[in-house]
Amino acid sequence: GTNASMRKAFNYQEVSKTAGKNCANCAQFIPGASASAAGACKVIPGDSQIQPTGYCDAYIVKK
């Protein structure tokens, strides 16, 4: 499922508009079964459709 209210609060985008910044390289992202599969996010609970290509205001580069 998705968490529409939290997505809106963090201005989540399915495809990042910022080069080099996306869910796949964010510390908050919980990867799915493969590199291109949808995953989850530590700051958007109850959402299993977070795209690795996505981006939101909670982005923190993975160290």
Swiss-Prot record:
Amino acids binding [4Fe-4S] cluster: C23, C26, C41, C56
GO biological process terms, semicolon-separated: aerobic electron transport chain
Protein keywords: 4Fe-4S, Electron transport, Iron, Iron-sulfur, Metal-binding, Transport
Record-linked Pfam families: HIPIP (PF01355)
GO-annotated molecular function: 4 iron, 4 sulfur cluster binding; electron transfer activity; metal ion binding
Subunit architecture: Homodimer.
Similarity annotation: Belongs to the high-potential iron-sulfur protein (HiPIP) family.
Function text: Specific class of high-redox-potential 4Fe-4S ferredoxins. Functions in anaerobic electron transport in most purple and in some other photosynthetic bacteria and in at least one genus (Paracoccus) of halophilic, denitrifying bacteria.
Name recorded for this polypeptide: High-potential iron-sulfur protein
